[in-house]
């Protein structure tokens, strides 16, 4: 049985780890390289490193921070932010990323996903989906894709888009609920489940973890293969070990360190 992965997320702005609420109100959470070392030592299964202003400010990811983070950390590292070309993917992989997250560029050109997957293998291409619920209370649930760090609406249906990019070669989908991001009120389980049911690739649940039960729900109710969290780890509410123990006690298959 495949083990559920716990993935701390480092959102980086101007070389510092930050944590926001619904993509805004960013507060400082430390040095990315030191954070990476701490999570590596704590037994995190993977680390997600997102340069959250790269697409918005139209510049590349901070490669020196990426390479120093990769150097300090032995768990798989997913890096995203400002990835626009096959050359960008290659540069990040050479800098030490194991997987590369594509967001805005995948929306603008889904064929880019196919091109990158063909060149480097679908196992290292992660499409990051930032979605917001746009349906009313009495309508069938519907979510819209946003790009540029959640700033730009696209009119695209999130579930349809997920299906399309997974067919084009995305090896994994990182699904973030913008409504839930930073609120600590739990994942948008309906969104996670709708996408997990629509695709054949692993889905990472993201946005809204407030406690350890939320991680369990992401897998059990949301159908996620991995759970991503930031606030509960960055600010010392829980450790990765506590999260793993809690999820294992709930009957989920986890990689437990000796």
Swiss-Prot record:
| Keyword Amino-acid biosynthesis appears in the UniProt entry | yes
Tell me the Gene Ontology biological-process terms attached to this UniProt entry.
L-histidine biosynthetic process
Q: What class of enzyme is it?
A: lyase
What Gene Ontology molecular function terms does this protein carry? imidazoleglycerol-phosphate synthase activity; lyase activity
What is this protein's function per UniProt?
Answer: IGPS catalyzes the conversion of PRFAR and glutamine to IGP, AICAR and glutamate. The HisF subunit catalyzes the cyclization activity that produces IGP and AICAR from PRFAR using the ammonia provided by the HisH subunit.
Subunit structure, interactors included? Heterodimer of HisH and HisF.
The UniProt family comment states: Belongs to the HisA/HisF family.
Q: What is the name of this protein?
A: Imidazole glycerol phosphate synthase subunit HisF
């Amino acid at each position: 049985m495949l083990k559920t992965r716990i993935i701390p997320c480092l959102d980086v702005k101007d070389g510092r780890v930050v944590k926001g609420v619904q993509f805004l109100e960013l507060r400082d959470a430390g040095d990315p390289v030191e954070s990476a070392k701490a999570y590596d030592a704590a037994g995190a299964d993977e680390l997600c490193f997102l340069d959250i202003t790269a697409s918005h400010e139209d510049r590349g990811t901070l490669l020196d921070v990426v390479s120093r983070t990769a150097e300090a950390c032995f768990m798989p590292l997913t890096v995203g932010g400002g990835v626009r070309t096959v050359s960008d993917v290659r540069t990040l992989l050479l800098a030490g990323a194991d997987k590369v997250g594509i967001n805005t560029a995948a929306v603008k050109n889904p064929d880019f996903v196919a091109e990158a997957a063909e060149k480097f293998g679908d196992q290292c291409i992660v499409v990051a989906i930032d979605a917001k619920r746009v349906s009313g209370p009495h309508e069938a649930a519907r979510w819209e894709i946003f790009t540029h760090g959640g700033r730009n609406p696209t009119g695209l249906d999130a579930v349809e888009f997920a299906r399309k990019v997974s067919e084009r070669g995305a090896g994994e989908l990182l699904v973030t609920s913008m409504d839930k991001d930073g609120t600590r009120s739990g994942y948008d389980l309906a969104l996670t489940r709708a996408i997990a049911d629509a695709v054949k690739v692993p889905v990472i649940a993201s946005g809204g973890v407030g406690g350890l039960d939320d991680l369990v729900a992401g897998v059990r109710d949301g159908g996620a293969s991995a759970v991503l969290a930031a606030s509960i780890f960055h600010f010392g509410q829980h450790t990765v070990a506590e999260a793993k123990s809690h999820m294992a006690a709930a009957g989920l298959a986890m990689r437990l360190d000796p």
